[in-house]
From Swiss-Prot:
EC numbers for this chain: 2.7.2.1
Binding, ATP: 15, 206-210, 283-285, 331-335
Family: Belongs to the acetokinase family.
Pathway the protein acts in: Metabolic intermediate biosynthesis; acetyl-CoA biosynthesis; acetyl-CoA from acetate: step 1/2
Top-level class of the enzyme under EC nomenclature: transferase
GO cellular component, one term: cytoplasm
Location(s) in or outside the cell: Cytoplasm
InterPro entries: Ac/propionate_kinase (IPR004372), Aliphatic_acid_kin_short-chain (IPR000890), Aliphatic_acid_kinase_CS (IPR023865), ATPase_NBD (IPR043129)
Function of the molecule: Catalyzes the formation of acetyl phosphate from acetate and ATP. Can also catalyze the reverse reaction.
GO biological process: acetate metabolic process; acetyl-CoA biosynthetic process
Cofactors: Mg(2+); Mn(2+)
Name under which the protein is recorded: Acetate kinase
Example GO molecular function: acetate kinase activity
């Protein structure tokens, strides 16, 4: 029985999940946080147990060593040979990767080369890949790209209306993100609806700290809200989403704290969205508490958030010429029934009727009334499982 580990490396973290394959059984999972900082934290969960230790972990290579030591220390594996595959989540695959890829030196170089498209994510992914290759050089190593699912978009969708030389010379175009999540929940939606994915029109809404909406036609992404980078689209936890680009030079010229375009983009990525408008938090739970206390900034942040998501869903209903189902997933999508209710309330013209008894915290599946023309589903995402499946698929080749 082989084991496959799915890795999601951040700039100072390494999240992992160990599977028995092909049974798709989760054996253990964990996260290593504060890599490169004092008092790093390694957390392992297995057999209804939880182990946490405080260490000083200087880099991703040491983090991988700690991870593997934890697996043997707790008896989760007897030796490293039980792990036959590792899959790495990579945010940006650019135009190099239309599907998951077996790792070699060239693939690692290309992942690093694409760091400009995902500066917070790709360098960390490359560090995680290099660490596993150094410690376990003989296992099957696979990169799974967030952008790959969106490579089915057509030029009229992914090109920006700017001179084409910026695409031909610099590959400036829409790439999208969260593709692994969008693909997974679309597949699960088809199962729940009892229909082939190849005949469905779906709108998938990944609503977490990052937010992206995708139009899925017969199993393929035909449009998505994130763009050249994951900054585009609806309002997010700390990201602005779409804004007028002329705002950037205007702020550089008028605000002494924003010295250049990079400073503005940093502000748009890390200090905007729910956090920026509310002035207090990027967490929807805090925003909803502000609604209860009638905090005007929380009310405004919430209303902007709902408005932006609603507009993208409406846009994709037009692109698809209607939809069979709308799927909510990720942190807020799965756990914020008020948000779902208020987004769908503005779409009742399309014949969508929520069932208030089903649209509650902790309920998954169809949350509409039986006669709703468009179904609304809440489906927990599982990007790690998709990564493990791709490792198994490529191992078999």
């Amino acid at each position: 029985m082989s084991k496959t580990i799915a890795i999601n490396a951040g700039s100072s973290s390494l999240k992992w999940q160990l599977y028995e394959m092909p049974e798709e059984k989760v054996v253990a999972k964990g996260i290593i946080e504060r890599i490169g900082l004092k008092d790093s934290i390694s957390t392992v969960k297995f057999d209804d147990k939880k182990d946490e230790q405080i260490l000083d972990i200087v880099d991703h290579t040491q983090a991988v060593k700690i991870l593997l030591e934890d697996l043997t220390k707790h008896g989760i594996i007897k030796d490293f040979n039980e792990i036959t595959g590792v899959g790495h989540r990579v945010v940006a695959g650019g135009e190099y990767f239309k599907e998951s890829a077996l790792v070699d030196d060239k693939v690692v170089e290309q992942v690093e080369e694409l760091s400009a498209l995902a500066p917070l994510h790709n360098p960390a992914a490359a560090a995680g890949i290099r660490a596993f290759r150094e410690i376990l050089p003989d296992i099957t190593s696979v990169c799974v790209f967030d952008t790959a699912f969106h490579t089915t978009m057509q030029p009229h969708t992914y090109l920006y209306p700017i001179p084409q030389k910026y695409y031909t010379d610099y590959k400036v175009r829409k790439y999208g993100a969260h593709g692994t999540s969008h693909q997974y929940v679309a597949q699960e939606a088809a199962k729940q609806l009892g229909r082939p994915l190849e005949e469905l029109k779906l709108i998938t809404a990944h609503v977490g700290n990052g937010v992206s909406i995708t139009a899925n036609y017969h199993g393929q992404s035909i449009d998505t809200s994130m763009g050249f980078t994951p900054l585009a689209g609806p309002m997010m936890g700390t990201r602005s989403g779409d804004i007028d680009p002329a705002i950037i030079p205007y702020l550089v010229a008028n605000d002494s704290e924003l010295e250049d375009a990079a400073a503005v983009v940093n502000m748009l990525n890390k200090q905007s969205g729910l956090l920026g408008v509310s002035g207090t938090s990027s967490d929807m739970r805090d925003i909803e508490a502000g609604l209860q206390s009638k905090d005007p900034n929380a009310v405004l942040a919430y209303n902007v958030f709902i408005d932006r998501i609603k507009k993208f869903i409406g846009q994709y209903l037009a692109v698809l010429n209607g939809a069979d189902a709308i799927i909510f997933t990720a942190g807020m999508g799965e756990n914020a029934p008020l948000m779902r209710q208020d987004v769908i309330a503005g779409l009742s013209w399309f014949g969508i009727e929520l069932d208030p008894e089903k649209n509650v915290f902790g309920y998954f599946g169809d949350i509409t009334k039986p006669d709703s023309k468009v179904k609304v589903l809440v489906i927990p995402t599982d990007e790690e499982l998709m990564i493990a499946r791709d490792v198994e698929r490529l191992k078999a080749k």
